[in-house]
């Protein structure tokens, strides 16, 4: 593959709902640019993008795949770095990594299915990152798909930015071509995406006039001169129209709508032309980071005439091909067989061979210019988000923003002795996927696996088996309850063993009551008068307390909110010891705690649920059924409602799946631990019984 300059590069991410046809679009573009000789098909398991065993088995994308294409553009050859992303939200981390290095996006929409949750999420991401985009409508070969209705829905949903650049031509209800609204000409498909000029059908004229007028109005808004000419009724040249539209697309003021058929490979030649003509090269943007040597903000255009800096945006770890670090060159030129400086790790790394990845294939290249995307194998310490530079110019870029995982399950190895193998395998998988997280819950003696959703966790378990040959089971996690008391009691604890020789004697009278602070295990005070218990035994009494609150007598959970006061007691000048007073305290605690109306406390989360307005009633009703307390609701900048509530952590188990079901995949949520509250009686009873059964089974 040739080396391309910054201005020749187009970094384009494919976005859209799962099943909309993103991978088919990638296959069609690969065919037309000579990468392949025939289009792969997802059901056949032979596409460039979906080469992983899990993707072939499940017939949908799980990881982002890079597919570089070489295309002869209007002003010379260009390189299109196509990033094919998963459509299912469980794999949103892959999408976020791809968007972080993309300079433009193609949102793929199935004409028959229309606007789906993945369409809306793709649009929101483009808005968030100010990404120029176009919408490519697939499935135009379906006789029952209405392009006109879809465009109306797109305009209603996303506003005046939507601009159809094409209108369909149908004969006998078959999709045979399109009208180019920009050039005002008919195009009839001949072979694959090739076409010939044809007459514009009369039935298109009305919609064509509306679409054309909107485009010309957008052109007029480019400058005062154009606006004046527009009001005078002057015509714009084709070059003026194309240049103005390109400006609007790059600035995000216009989102072209184009169309095609994946099955028949129609419409993709024009899509390639649009990528070349309307999408920006990286030098339209700035790299923003921090100059480590000065601590000041660093900004620079993508430019290969300065020192090297590159950002690692993705890591691939494969048991067979090894580890690859994918990076976008921000400034300078990256060459093979050189030493670079990892700014985040403050260490140097040896760059061996330099590669372009195309699906599972590695293509060796000599160098990569600013704005380009490539891969380096077997870097020792480098991870996703790290910045590679030169030691004399240490620039560090921000790590890609990835969604926080809130869905979690307990996991354990099926076979004894494989815990280390599982941990090693998961560590490698977490290098690849930043939305995966492992937490060791020592209190409940369980290991927790966090992800975006159940589907992602299912894929992880399957990959552990197929890639790393370890079997792992998932189960419902245990939740961290607490124990406390509700009334004041006064008890005696006496530890006495005196049967000849040196004995044991400790005697305490203690008061136990609520401290009012559920964030602190205990508060200890002493009110001894007259030396009934010598002061040197006070620490032993507190040690007994420290041991007791680790595991309460109700269900074995830690104790919180306890105030213990040593009031009185007695001692023996020979037989008393620190151990004896510690044991006496333990006896007093066990008796007193159970007499003081003990209760279980459950963890409460502060929850935020973001949903479209029409789903708020269903969501709030569901929260009430989950024992949640809705605290309030307000609108965010996307016009969605943000519901705030307090809810028991245990009631959030399975919430991800239920929320998606209620909102058609358009609901998001986040939560954090807030505090402990007394659990209802039935919950306490169920938990105590479960803990007792688990203890009996040990």
Regions inferred by a protein language model and the residue ranges of each:
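Structural and coupling elements of P-loop NTPases
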Residues: 1-698
């Amino acid at each position: 593959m040739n080396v391309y300059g910054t201005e020749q590069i187009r970094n384009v991410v494919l976005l859209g709902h799962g099943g909309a046809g993103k991978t088919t679009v990638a296959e069609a573009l690969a065919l037309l640019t000579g990468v392949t000789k025939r289009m792969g098909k997802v059901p056949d398991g032979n596409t460039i993008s979906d080469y992983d065993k899990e993707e072939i088995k499940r017939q949908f994308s799980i990881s982002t795949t890079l597919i570089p294409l070489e295309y002869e553009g209007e002003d010379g050859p260009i390189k299109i770095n196509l990033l094919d992303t998963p459509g299912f939200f469980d794999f949103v981390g892959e999408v976020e990594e791809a968007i972080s290095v993309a300079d433009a996006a193609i949102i793929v929409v199935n004409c028959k299915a229309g606007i789906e949750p993945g369409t809306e999420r793709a649009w929101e991401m483009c808005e968030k990152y100010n990404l120029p985009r176009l919408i490519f409508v697939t499935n135009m070969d379906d006789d029952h798909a209405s392009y006109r209705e879809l465009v109306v829905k797109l305009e209603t949903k996303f506003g005046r930015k939507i601009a159809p650049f094409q209108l369909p031509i149908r004969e006998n209800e078959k999709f045979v071509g399109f009208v180019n609204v920009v050039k005002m000409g008919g195009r009839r498909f001949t072979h694959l995406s090739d076409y010939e000029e044809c007459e514009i059908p009369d039935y298109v004229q009305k919609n064509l006039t509306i679409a054309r007028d909107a485009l010309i109005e957008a052109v007029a808004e480019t400058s005062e001169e154009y606006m004046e000419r527009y009001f005078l009724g002057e015509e714009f040249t084709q070059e003026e129209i194309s240049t103005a539209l390109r400006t609007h697309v790059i600035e995000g003021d216009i989102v072209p709508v184009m169309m095609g058929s994946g099955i028949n490979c129609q419409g993709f030649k024009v899509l390639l032309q649009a990528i070349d003509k309307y999408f920006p090269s990286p030098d339209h943007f700035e790299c923003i980071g921090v100059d480590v040597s000065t601590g000041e903000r660093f900004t620079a255009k993508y430019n290969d005439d300065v020192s090297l800096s590159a950002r690692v945006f993705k890591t691939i770890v494969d048991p067979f091909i090894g580890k690859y670090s994918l990076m976008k060159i921000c400034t300078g030129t990256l060459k093979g067989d050189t030493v670079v400086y990892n700014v985040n790790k403050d260490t140097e790394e040896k760059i061996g061979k330099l590669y372009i990845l195309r699906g599972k294939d590695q293509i060796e290249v000599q160098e990569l210019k600013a704005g380009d995307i490539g891969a380096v194998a077997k870097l020792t310490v480098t991870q996703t988000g790290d910045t590679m530079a030169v030691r004399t110019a240490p620039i560090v870029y921000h790590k890609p923003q990835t969604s926080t995982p809130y869905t979690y399950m307990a996991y354990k190895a099926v076979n004894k002795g494989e815990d280390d193998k599982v941990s090693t395998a998961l560590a490698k998988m977490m290098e690849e996927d930043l939305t995966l997280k492992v937490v060791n819950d020592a209190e409940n003696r369980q290991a927790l696996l966090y992800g975006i959703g159940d589907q992602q966790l299912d894929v992880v378990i399957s990959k552990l088996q197929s890639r790393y040959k370890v079997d792992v089971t998932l189960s419902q996690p245990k939740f961290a309850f607490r124990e406390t008391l509700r009334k004041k009691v006064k008890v005696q604890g006496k530890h006495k063993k005196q049967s000849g020789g040196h004995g044991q004697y400790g005697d305490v009278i203690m008061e136990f009551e609520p401290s009012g602070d559920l964030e602190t295990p205990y508060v200890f005070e002493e009110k001894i008068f007259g030396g009934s218990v010598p002061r040197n035994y006070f620490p032993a009494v507190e040690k007994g307390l420290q041991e007791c609150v680790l595991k309460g007598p109700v269900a074995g959970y830690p104790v919180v909110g306890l105030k213990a006061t040593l009031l009185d007691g007695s001692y023996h000048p020979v037989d008393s010891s620190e151990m004896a007073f510690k044991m006496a305290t333990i006896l007093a605690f066990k008796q007193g705690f159970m007499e003081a109306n003990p209760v279980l406390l459950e963890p409460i989360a502060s929850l935020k649920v973001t949903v479209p307005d029409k789903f708020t009633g269903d969501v709030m009703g569901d929260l009430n059924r989950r024992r949640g307390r809705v605290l309030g609701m307000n609108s965010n900048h996307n016009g969605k409602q943000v519901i705030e509530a307090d809810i028991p952590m245990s009631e959030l188990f399975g919430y991800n799946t239920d929320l998606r079901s209620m909102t058609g995949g358009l609901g998001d949520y986040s939560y954090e631990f807030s505090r402990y509250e007394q659990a209802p009686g039935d919950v306490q009873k169920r938990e105590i019984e479960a803990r007792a059964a688990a203890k009996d089974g040990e």
